[in-house]
Amino acid sequence: MSYRNDYLYLREKFDPKAEFITLKKFRMNILNTPFESYNYDILPGEEHYHCQTHDVSFEESYTLDSKISAPHLDELLKIDDSRIEENIFFTYPIFKSFTLKKSKEVIILLHGLNEKSWEKYLPWAHKLVEYTGKTVLLFPTAFHMNRAPASWADPRFMNKVCKERKQFYPKVTNSSLANAAISTRLQFLPQRFIWSGLQTYYDILQLIDQIRAGTHPHIHKDAQIDFFSYSVGSFLAEIMILANENDYFKNSKLCMFCGGPLLNRMSPASKYILDSEANVAIYSFFIEHLEVELKRDKRLAHYFSDLHHIGKYFKSMLDYNKMITFRENRLKKIAKRISALALQKDEVVPSIEVELSLHGHDNKIPIKVKSIDFPYPYDHVIPFPISEKDEKEVDKWFAKSMKFIAGQLK
């Protein structure tokens, strides 16, 4: 079958509410597996915070509103992040070959920023199972996919949000219904970027805890765990491999697709990702004024300190020209387990920035980076179009891309 036909078939078959989906054509099953996050109390919205590891307490210091007369913006902002149930109780899909045995080899797939549906990733997961023989687990980032309130994807509500953004910020660019929710939330509280990232980080550790304890219904307790990541999912995956919490990822491989650069080497302003106001807010907070902001935000400063090495690795991945020795020495140690596939016409994650970030300032980090240019119209968000016009070329290059990725994860 063609990529297009596979995509349409999987889109029709996939139901995130169905516990078990049989794909007879591929001799695979999709298992939508329930998960309860125990890490939501790190998010904005709590009155008091406590770091159990270091027995340190903090008070909430964020104001969750826009401070302007914009009812729909405020509806998005005044909600307590830590109380959003969809982000605590959710399911994640597992692609698994026909077998009753628990999987001993698993690839965790991490998606891009502002994703609301698994549709794009279904053919990717299917091909990785086919080419590697491994199980593929698609894990959603906090407030993405099925971890967000339905209203954030409601066209009528988002249209009102979008109009308010343009009213108060007439110079905004790349504003759209697709990115109105995430742009609003990150513009007014850029710290959400790190807190939701940390929740996802700890959720994945919780998942690994479950696997290692032997209580996961579909994955063997001694399973090899690798990562395939796309876009900003690569930012998180890379940090996880760098930090190697609990020694869980000492043997894990990571292959990144359209991902890999440091934060200040990416350009996420897009109608599908972030609008210009949110992009500027993120850059201003994490790149230009981070040290000043950390003096104001004691809890964030605690998690960015040497006491939490996840925070230190996150900090090291923000700016290409800072923490160079710390970051690149660690990358050199894990280089043989990391690889990347970059696209030359990618304007969000430019291929040259993937190479510069992963090869280091001295160009001596031996991370494998392959840069290609598809012979059909594509971009970062849609690398494999489903139109009939270029169907044969898309089939060819999708297969080549997935075979390269699978080869790095075998």
Where are these regions (language model features)?
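Low-complexity, serine/threonine/proline-enriched polar segments
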Residues: 16-39, 44-53, 142, 160-177, ...
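Alpha/beta-hydrolase active-site loop
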Residues: 154-218
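Serine-hydrolase catalytic core
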Residues: 277-410
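N-terminal cap/lid segment of alpha/beta-hydrolase-fold proteins
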Residues: 21-102
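Short, surface-exposed "cap/lid" segments of acyl-processing enzymes
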Residues: 93-173
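Active-site loop->helix "elbow" adjoining a glycine-rich segment at hydrolase catalytic centers
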Residues: 196, 231-234
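Hydrolase active-site cap/lid region
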Residues: 215-230, 238-308
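Phosphate/oxyanion-binding active-site loops and adjacent basic polyanion-contact surfaces
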Residues: 84-88, 193-204, 390, 394
